[in-house]
Structure formats: structure tokens, C-alpha cells
């Protein structure tokens, strides 16, 4: 048992492989697990085990994602790999598997391709903070100059989408060659095979270049209100799950969204009918609020540390629109479409005022299955921040999912 306890002392980081179809994302994922399995720090996974990704549902959308876990000397990782391009788009937009950093896989034989570009853009828009590049299939390219050109092209593309193209580590290797060596000799250690060493080199880069994320408990307090009731003689209680941060009795919080923002003091905290000194991220709590009437709080508001979040009505977002087969709309929609936007705990009506495609063109309409950037105007202000996820609903069913990329008003 001591061992399991020791493992939990390592910081946990969520990563994933992104990049164009057939550039070797899944092969690389398999190579990483097999390489680290030789150190007893992962369970080796075959390509077909990862490729047969289980279905998940996130914000009403079915996504195929495979999760593997492994550790290095420094950290414990959860790694997500999606089989299809559409699954990546959906996963990144819904945040089904939130990534603290990603490994961008680019085939040296092909260079950056359309999905390479799209995944970099998505990573930027949905807030994946850092990328490391694995230049794969270098065994198929004899020309050093060609490799340097491909690297240059990748760095320019990264810079174009506001990643630090000049400093991002690019590791050259061959996931397939490393995998073949590990399959031939599963005990291969560092220093025994040049291709396997490239996998170690990649993991060193991931360890050092992708920062350890700030834990949710260390972020400013936020709780979306799910329910409200009053306790005779004591006041009004708002219940919900603490999304981030921590809260103690006596602290000041703001009620944000739907109405004028107002301040109040926490006079009591309860969890499972017991009083609590401090609530932390992940707890489902009841918060007793001083001087607030039951009719002044409603579902859809948030309780937050003062001055950390503000109410807004207009924003830009990256959106995936569900296909008919996914339970989405059967017909396209046009600018002026007015669905519900489900944010945290509530639906708010809003108008989609305009949309643009990736290349900056303005399509006349949005078809089921499309990914677009859209500008939204809500009829009521609610607490919104960049990187926040939401669902688009119509008559109670999900027709799209999105992430806020920019606040306008």
C-alpha cells in the first residue's frame, strides 16, 4: 500500500496528443506507455487498445476518447488520444478531457497539414496553455535540410496562432520505430536504443516545458448557485458545488449575474447536514448568506470572491454544432437564431448575431456538424469568463457546444 501513497505525491498533469490524421498520434501514445512500462511507470497499451476508444458523453455530445495514464520521475500524467478528427474538435470544445498541455504530432514526411493548423488554432482558442512538438516519421526523411524546413514551417505556424514558436521544444523521432523496439524487447531502457531515447527526450520536454497547472483550490473562489432556500431565523442558503478556490465563514463574497452584483458575508457553511469550517473546490455545500432575501438569489447566479468575475452579455465563441445523428438540428440556422445558452447551472436566451468560418469567410448559414466562431448576445447578463464552456439548447435538447474565446461586453 505504501507505494500507491508515494505515487500520489507527484503532481498530476493532463496532456493529450493532437495533430493531423495518420501523422502517428496513437502510435506515439502506445510508444510512450510501452517505453515507460519498462520502468514500471505505466501499463503498456497496444495501438488497437488505444484506438478502440470508449464513447463518452460531454455536454450532451458523444465523443470517442481513449485515456491512458503513466508517470515519469517527476509527474503523474493522464493522457487523452482521440481516434477521429471530429472527436478532437468536440473534445477540445466541450472540455471533456481538459488538457494542461498537448503534444502536437507532425509527420516529417508531410509537414503541417490542414488538421495540424486547426488543432493549433483550437488549442489557442480553448486555452490549452502549452504545446510540445513531436516531429514523427523522421526515419522516412533522409534529407536534413528538409527536416529543418519542416521545423521552420511548424514554428511559423505556432507563432501565427500566438504560441511561442521560437521556444517550443521540437523533438524528432519515430513512434513506430520506438514501438517496434519495445515490442521486440519490452525491457529496453534509456540509452539502449536511439529511437526509444527519443521517447524519453519527448517526456523530458513535456516534464520541463508544460507547467504544472495551478490547482483548482488555489484559484479564486467560485460557486454556481443550484438551489436556494431559507432557514427560519437564520437567513438564506444557496447550495451548489464549489468550482474552484476555498471559502470560510466570515468571508465576503459577491453574487454575480442576472441582476446587479452585490456583496454579502458568509455566515455559515454546511455539507451533508454538518457544519463546515472551510469549503474547497469539489465540495457540494450550502452557504448561508447575511442580509439576503430568498427572492434575491436564483439558480444561474454565482457566488465568487469579490472582483474576480463580472457579468457580461456579449462574447465570441468557438462552437461545434451537432449533427442530426447526434441528436442535433436537422436543418441549418442563420444569423439571428435565438436558442438557449446553458451556462454552469442555467439556461439563458441569446441571439447568435454573426458567425465566421476558420478562414475568416462569412458563411450564410451554419449546418449541423459545422465548427464555427460565433458572436452571441444574451438577454440577461451572467458571470462569464474566457475559456468557459457552455451548451446550446433548443427545446431542452443540446444542439451545440461552445467555449468562450473572447468577451465583448
UniProtKB/Swiss-Prot annotation:
Pfam families in alphabetical order: GTP_EFTU, GTP_EFTU_D2, GTP_EFTU_D3
ATP-binding among keywords: no
Amino acids binding GTP: 19-26, 81-85, 136-139
Region of interest (G3), residue spans: 81-84
UniProt KW Disulfide bond keyword: no
EC number annotated for this UniProt entry: 3.6.5.3
SUPFAM superfamilies recorded: EF-Tu/eEF-1alpha/eIF2-gamma C-terminal domain, P-loop containing nucleoside triphosphate hydrolases, Translation proteins
The organism's place on the tree of life at top rank: Bacteria
Keyword annotations from UniProtKB, A to Z: Cytoplasm, Elongation factor, GTP-binding, Hydrolase, Magnesium, Metal-binding, Nucleotide-binding, Protein biosynthesis
GO MF entries: GTP binding; GTPase activity; translation elongation factor activity
G1: annotated segments: 19-26
One GO CC annotation: cytosol
Subcellular location, record wording: Cytoplasm
Domain tr-type G: 10-214
Main location, first listed in the record: cytoplasm
Residues noted as binding Mg(2+) in the record, renumbered to the chain: 26
Region (G5): 174-176
Region (G2): 60-64
Chain positions covered by the region annotation G4: 136-139
Family stated for the protein in its record: Belongs to the TRAFAC class translation factor GTPase superfamily. Classic translation factor GTPase family. EF-Tu/EF-1A subfamily.
Summary of the function given for this chain in its UniProt record: GTP hydrolase that promotes the GTP-dependent binding of aminoacyl-tRNA to the A-site of ribosomes during protein biosynthesis.
Protein name, as recorded: Elongation factor Tu
Organism the protein comes from: Synechococcus sp. (strain JA-3-3Ab) (Cyanobacteria bacterium Yellowstone A-Prime)
Gene: tuf
